[in-house]
Amino acid sequence: MNDIELIYDKVKDKYNLTLTNSLALNEGFTWDVPVIYGEFQQGRFWLYADEDVPNPHGIEFVFSVEYEKQTWFRKQPKKYHTHWHPQTIEQAIQDIDKFMLGKHPFIK
């Protein structure tokens, strides 16, 4: 079991997530890696491991998020896309929890 599968195994009973591969998502990935895909109220996320990026903790995780946020001066919510690199399995799980529960600072 790889790290992405391990993370999925720890959260699959809490949330409606998909464990698949990046090419199957047809989201513009140019390489094929295992990925956890999830949708939350304001958007969606992809969590995958980039094995080509050096990391002192092992594999480098990439948490990519697309979300909408309402601002006081716009009638329609604005779409944002960002990503970061959780350093551990536990950090990746915490990020999933925060988004799925609507508690991440990006979407508050």
Residue ranges and their predicted role:
Residues 1-41:
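Negatively charged, low-complexity tracts enriched in Asp/Glu with abundant Ser/Thr
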Residues 7, 18-20, 24-26, 48, ...:
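Compositionally biased amphipathic helical and low-complexity segments enriched in hydrophobic
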Residues 1-2, 101-108:
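Short intrinsically disordered terminal tails
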Residues 10-14, 31, 44-46, 63-67, ...:
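Polar/charged side chains located within well-ordered beta-strands of beta-rich proteins
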Residues 88-100:
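A short, charged, amphipathic alpha-helix used as a generic interaction element across diverse proteins
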Residues 41-91:
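Intrinsically disordered, low-complexity regulatory segments enriched in Ser/Thr/Pro
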